[in-house]
């Protein structure tokens, strides 16, 4: 099964997450199929908090990929940002 989930990066006490497509059997920071965007929970000022290729997310969901709960919330946030822009 394929999932769209977060993989952690960044420094200690300063997390940064990539939103990726991966097989559920892969480790959290292991092999991925495609990188769809990123999530910066500590963004400040004009830095974007979520950058996500919603067209590719729709493609993967159409092919049977499942989103984790956090990625589903980020996807909604990215779609609302795109609609507002």
Swiss-Prot record:
Family: Belongs to the bacterial ribosomal protein bS16 family.
InterPro entries: Ribosomal_bS16, Ribosomal_bS16_CS, Ribosomal_bS16_dom_sf
Domain of life of the native organism: Bacteria
PROSITE patterns assigned: RIBOSOMAL_S16
Pfam families, sorted: Ribosomal_S16
Species this chain originates from: Xanthomonas oryzae pv. oryzae (strain KACC10331 / KXO85)
GO molecular function: structural constituent of ribosome
Entry keyword set: Ribonucleoprotein, Ribosomal protein
This protein's GO CC annotations: cytoplasm; small ribosomal subunit
PANTHER family in the record: 30S RIBOSOMAL PROTEIN S16 (PTHR12919), SMALL RIBOSOMAL SUBUNIT PROTEIN BS16M (PTHR12919:SF20)
NCBIfam families, A to Z: S16
One record GO biological process: translation
Name this polypeptide is given: Small ribosomal subunit protein bS16
